[in-house]
Amino acid sequence: YIKTISLIVIVFFTSSCSKILDVKPVSTITSENYWNTENDVTGYLTGIYYDLRSSVNTTFYMEDRGDTFSPGLESGLSSAWQQNLTSSNAPNWIGYYNLIHHCNLVIKYGNIISFTNGNNKNRALAEAHFIRAFTYFWLLRSWGDVPIVLEPTESDQIVLPSRAPQGQVMDQILNDVNLAITLFPESGFVNKSRASKPAAYALKTDALLWKAKVLAGGDASLSEALVSADLAMAGVSLDPNFANIFSAKNGQEVIFSLYFKREEMFDQAGKKIEKSDQYGSTLKPRDIFVSDATNVNEIAFSRGGARSAYAPSQKFRDL
């Protein structure tokens, strides 16, 4: 009798647990249930810009490998600047492919979802194609041959692609940027902190110059770059006031910028500081080095952990 009751209890709880475990969690957001409205597309796209800021907010891949910088007032030069990269400290492309994955999601579902305004749909798709081209151009210049992934990864049943030749990667960059140019409904700017048709022409110009010089594109690529450069300059002009170039107001010289809100930069005491991983902090002097300067109010300086690890090189200043 006791054994029978025990068996019944075990069966009851086992079946109950099974039913509980089989319940589909209604609060879980996945690709299967997220993409429904145009707000889902535009909201997701805004999040991509956040990831883009993190990916390019570094000197590691570009300036550190060139001759633009020299040592600044404080230590902290990267291993890339010191030409001391090894298998243990070298960077990787995970963050960039994560960014590409998000763009692939917007492109896939943005094409499926209906928008009340066709221009808004085209602009969202254009921005996604622009960011994907921008990211692949970054990868191409850093690693050369890289895998080309044009579909989002929505299953663990995938085959990892091999690295594609640089010429093929460049073709994909230009395909994306040309499609972005076609899709943008405006010829000018809606928001200079987001991609636009002039920004797409500027990216195309940069890519064509790389193709001409590094990938043996020759005069044909240079000629196409000249045409694209003229189109990129529509609506912008040189500012007679040099200081305005560094203003947060996106002046008349700006074609594309990434937005950083000052309120993001607070220490634990609530004091406004510049985060040490902000791009500009590597070039600015610490406040303690300029506090006694007669023109301290005219000097851009950093607080807290930020420091001027770099200074413009003599070669750069001689330009």
Language model: regions and residue ranges:
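Membrane-proximal, proline-rich intrinsically disordered regions
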Residues: 17-61
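Bacterial Sec-dependent N-terminal signal peptides
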Residues: 1-26
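Short coil/turn linking the two alpha-helices of tandem helical-hairpin repeats
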Residues: 140-142, 147, 188, 210-219
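Elongated scaffold/linker segments in the mid-to-C-terminal portions of large proteins
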Residues: 78, 234-319
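Conserved, well-structured interaction surfaces
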Residues: 42-44, 50-52, 73-143, 158-168, ...
